[in-house]
Amino acid sequence: MPVSIVIGSQWGDEGKGKIVDLLSPDVDIVARYQGGANAGHTIVWDEEGETEEFVLHLVPSGIFHEGVTCVIGNGVVLDPKAILEEIEKIESLGIDVEGRLKISHNAHLIMPYHKAIEAAQEEDRASASDDDEIGTTGRGIGPAYTDKFARTGIRVVDLLDEDVLRRKLRRSIEEKNAILRDVYDAEALDVDRIVEEYVEFDQKIDDYVTDTSAYLSRALDDGARVLAEGAQGSLLDVDFGSYPYVTSSHPTAGGCCTGLGVSPTEIDRVLGIAKAYCTRVGNGPFPTELDGEVGQALREKGGEFGATTGRPRRCGWLDLVALRYTCMVNGFNELALTKLDILSGIDELKVCTEYRYDGKTTRRFPSEPQNLTRVEPQYETLPGWEADISAVRHVDDLPRAAQDYLAFIENYLDVEIGLVSNGPRRSQIITDVQPMAAA
C-alpha cells in the first residue's frame, strides 16, 4: 500500500477526519495535500470510558497515533498563527508533536491582507446580490491561492530569510492596501505591525519546515505506507465542482499528486467518503435539498453545523447522480459511507437516481451551476428502519432495510462500500460490509 487517498465525495463535511483517524494506525505517514484552515476535521475518541472531541483544521488527524508522522504539503495554504495555535492545543493534550510534523517549505502563507480582502469581496458581493455571495469561511483561502497563481505569494521558505521576508511583505501589503482602499473602500493594514509579527514566526516554525516532497519520496522508496487526505469535497473542486461556488484548490484525486509531489504511479487506493444523505455549507446549487421538517431533523440529529464556521449546513437526500460523477472524476475503488445512524426513524428514504432537465431524464451531472439549478431530482423510494443502529458492529446485525440501502448504493455506483460509520466515536464503525451488492 504505497499511497492511499481519502477524498470527500460530496460537498465536504463527509466525515473524512474519522476515517483518516481509523486508518492511521496502519500507516507510517498521513499527509494533507490541499486547502487551509477553512476545513475542520472532527475527531471523537474514547479514553477510559470518556468521550472527547477535537477539531483539526491543518494538522492531519494521524497526529493522535503514536509513531505516525504528519505532513502538510506544498498544496496547502498555511496560516502561521493557526498552525501554531493548533500545535499548542495538541501538545496540551499530552501528545508529542516534535519530530512528527513536517511542513512543506513550498506551502504558501495566508496573510492578514488575504482575510481582509476576502471579507471585503464577500461584503461587496452581498451588497450586489445574494446570489453572487459565495459564502466563504473568511479564512483568506481564495486570496492566498490567487497570489500563489499570480506568482506574488509568500511561501513558508520566505519565513527563513528575514531580509527576503521583509522585502516581499512590504511590497505585498502596500499593493493590497491600495486594493482595500481604492476598490473596496476598506481600512488599510499596518505594514510595520504585520512585518514584525511574521518575522517572529520564523523562530517558532523553523523546526517543522522541510522539503516534504523529497521526504515522501525517500519514505516511499523505503517502503513507508502513506495516507493522503484532502479537505472539503470533490463537488467543491475549483475545476470539477459547481463553479464559482467552489473552493480554490483541488480536493479531487489529482490534487494529491500536485499537492504533495508524489507520482500517480505510487497511488493504489482511492477511498471516497460519502454521507448517507447530503449536506452543503454556503451558497450554490443543491438539487436534493430539503427545506421542510425532514431537512431540519437531519440537521439537528446529525449535528450539521460547520466545524470551522458553526454555520448550519443545508441538508438533503442522497444524490447518486452527483456521487456517480465524483466516482468518475476520482476513480474510487472503494467507498466509506458515514452517518448511516442518522437515517434511523425515517419511514421512507428517497434517493436521487436521475435528473430531469429540459423535459428529459439523465444520469449525467451538469457541473455548470446555471444548469444544476434547473434540474429536478428524480427519486427512488426505499423503506426506512426504526431501530437505533449506533451499537451495531457487524453488517449482518443491521436491519434488512439498512442493508438494502447499502446494496442499492453499491449497485447504482458499481463501487463497493468497504466501511460504514454509524456514530461519531472511533468504535462506531462496521468493517465487514463487502460485498453488499450481492446481498
UniProtKB/Swiss-Prot annotation:
Catalytic residue positions: D13 (proton acceptor), H41 (proton donor)
Gene Ontology molecular functions: adenylosuccinate synthase activity; GTP binding; magnesium ion binding
Cofactors required: Mg(2+)
Residues that, per the record, bind IMP: D13, E14, G15, K16, N38, A39, G40, H41, T137, R151, Q232, T247, R311
Cofactor binding annotation: Binds 1 Mg(2+) ion per subunit.
Keyword annotations of the record: Cytoplasm, GTP-binding, Ligase, Magnesium, Metal-binding, Nucleotide-binding, Purine biosynthesis
GO biological process, one term: IMP metabolic process
Known pathway: Purine metabolism; AMP biosynthesis via de novo pathway; AMP from IMP: step 1/2
The enzyme's E.C. designation: 6.3.4.4
PANTHER family, sorted: ADENYLOSUCCINATE SYNTHETASE
Protein name, UniProt field: Adenylosuccinate synthetase
Source organism per UniProt: Salinibacter ruber (strain DSM 13855 / M31)
Name of the coding gene: purA
